[in-house]
């Protein structure tokens, strides 16, 4: 039986994929606009002299945008009707016993269901699927941040402010309890600060946009075992890409490229848990790199590794620094690592006590010892040589130190 007339009528009435994409694009554009207005409003109310007219204008614009979002959200009804239309088509075609046409009609039902679900996800997500714009070249800006774990506890973070520029490699150091890991948890949204603000590329992070802001971030934790989900290295890297809804056709190249960047392309078919500690951490870094975050946070990423593993991870971090395509924030106990950084942030009992170049920190051995931090190895060697009357110029690594000694 020829069902072409039935399909022709259906095609003239159905909602297309282009219609869905146009609806979602329009909706996301309004969510982006609302986020920008929220940023403007927050910045305005924090000023000493608030312009009441400007405040009223922003509030009015926020209301107008919310009305538009509500209007577009109401189109869900049309997509529900579209699903009913496809289901009606399927019922009609099923009666004809033409299997090819039945499969074709069934596929139309699946498409209509998928489109309705996609639209609902965007609406229910309230803009969580949008990508925030970069409003500034400052990757991370923390202003007067304070946090305590409970009313009876002292501040774990006490009025801390600092900035990290796009492409910088910055380390945060401090003894146990200094607050460095707390800052990491606040940045990724695990904890909420009681006071102060965080900006990611100029976007003020708040309850409404935390999910979008986190898309700028990739994090490598202390214990890579906790990050493994897949049965192979390849599957583990793929897991994050699937969650990000990357085109499956593009995934093999992305997986291979990220594995090559950390020297683990040979292990793609291996089980992650059977690898060495350093290799596991390299896989964790590859999984993060595959998602292409603008900011990479290394939270004590070398603390559980043997010396060989530590060296391998630090070499990867230096390679990333040299590309200047990623902003690197490393929270670390490893005092030798700070020599690779552009800038060092020092915390003590929740307070920011110093921001300086690595060599400035290494040179001030009394300062480090007063806040219970180890002096990096090159600093200790220089100190011992100076005691014996041998003056050595400041060096940032062991190779430079050996070269200086050989010249004596």
Curated annotation (Swiss-Prot):
GO MF annotation terms: ATP binding; ATP hydrolysis activity; ATPase-coupled transmembrane transporter activity
Cellular-component GO terms for this entry: ATP-binding cassette (ABC) transporter complex
Record's keyword terms, sorted: ATP-binding, Cell membrane, Membrane, Nucleotide-binding, Translocase, Transport
Superkingdom of the organism of origin: Bacteria
Entries under Pfam families matching the protein: ABC_tran
EC assignment: 7.-.-.-
InterPro entries listed in its UniProt record: AAA+_ATPase (IPR003593), ABC_transporter-like_ATP-bd (IPR003439), ABC_transporter-like_CS (IPR017871), ABC_transpr_CbiO/EcfA_su (IPR015856), ECF_ABC_transporter_ATP-bd (IPR050095), EcfA_1 (IPR030947), P-loop_NTPase (IPR027417)
SUPFAM superfamilies: P-loop containing nucleoside triphosphate hydrolases
Covalent S-S links between cysteines: none
Domain ABC transporter: 140-374
Topology versus the membrane: Peripheral membrane protein
Enzyme class: translocase
Compartments it resides in: Cell membrane
Binding site for ATP: 174-181
Known function: ATP-binding (A) component of a common energy-coupling factor (ECF) ABC-transporter complex. Unlike classic ABC transporters this ECF transporter provides the energy necessary to transport a number of different substrates.
Membership in a protein family: Belongs to the ABC transporter superfamily. Energy-coupling factor EcfA family.
Description of how the protein assembles with itself and partners: Forms a stable energy-coupling factor (ECF) transporter complex composed of 2 membrane-embedded substrate-binding proteins (S component), 2 ATP-binding proteins (A component) and 2 transmembrane proteins (T component).
Protein name per its UniProtKB record: Energy-coupling factor transporter ATP-binding protein EcfA1
């Amino acid at each position: 039986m020829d069902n072409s007339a039935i399909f022709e009528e259906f095609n003239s009435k159905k909602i297309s994929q282009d219609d869905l994409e146009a609806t979602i694009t329009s909706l996301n554009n309004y969510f982006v606009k609302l986020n920008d207005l929220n940023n403007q409003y927050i910045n305005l109310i924090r000023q000493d002299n608030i312009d009441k007219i400007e405040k009223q204008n922003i509030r009015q614009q926020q209301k107008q945008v919310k009305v538009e979002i509500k209007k577009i959200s109401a189109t869900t009804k049309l997509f529900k009707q579209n699903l009913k239309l496809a289901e009606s088509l399927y019922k009609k075609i099923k009666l004809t016993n033409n299997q090819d046409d039945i499969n074709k009609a069934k596929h139309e039902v699946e498409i209509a269901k998928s489109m309705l679900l996609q639209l609902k996800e965007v609406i229910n997500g309230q803009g969580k699927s949008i990508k925030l714009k970069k409003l500034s070249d400052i990757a991370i800006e923390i202003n007067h941040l304070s946090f305590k774990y409970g009313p009876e506890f002292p501040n774990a973070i006490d009025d801390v402010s600092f900035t990290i520029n796009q492409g910088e490699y910055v380390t945060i150091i401090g003894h146990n309890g200094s607050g460095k890991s707390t800052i990491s948890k606040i940045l990724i949204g695990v904890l909420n600060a009681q006071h102060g603000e965080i900006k990611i590329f100029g976007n003020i992070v708040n309850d409404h946009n935390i999910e979008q802001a986190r898309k700028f971030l990739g994090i490598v934790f202390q214990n890579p075992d906790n990050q493994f989900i897949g049965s192979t290295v390849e599957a583990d890297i793929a897991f994050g890409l699937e969650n990000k809804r990357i085109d499956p056709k593009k995934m093999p190249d992305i997986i291979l490229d990220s594995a090559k960047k950390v020297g683990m392309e040979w292990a793609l078919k291996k089980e992650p848990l059977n690898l060495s500690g350093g290799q596991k951490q390299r896989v964790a870094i590859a999984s993060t790199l595959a998602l292409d975050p603008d900011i990479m946070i290394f939270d004590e990423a070398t603390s559980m590794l043997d010396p060989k593993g530590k060296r391998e991870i630090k070499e990867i971090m230096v390679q990333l620094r040299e590309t200047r395509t990623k902003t690197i924030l490393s929270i670390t106990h490893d005092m030798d690592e700070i020599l690779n950084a552009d800038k060092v942030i020092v915390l003590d009992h929740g307070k920011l006590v110093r921001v300086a170049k690595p060599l400035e920190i290494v040179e001030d051995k009394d300062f480090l010892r007063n806040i219970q931090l180890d002096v990096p190895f090159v600093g200790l060697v220089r100190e011992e040589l100076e005691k014996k009357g041998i003056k050595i110029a400041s060096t940032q690594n062991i190779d430079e130190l050996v070269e200086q000694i050989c010249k004596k």
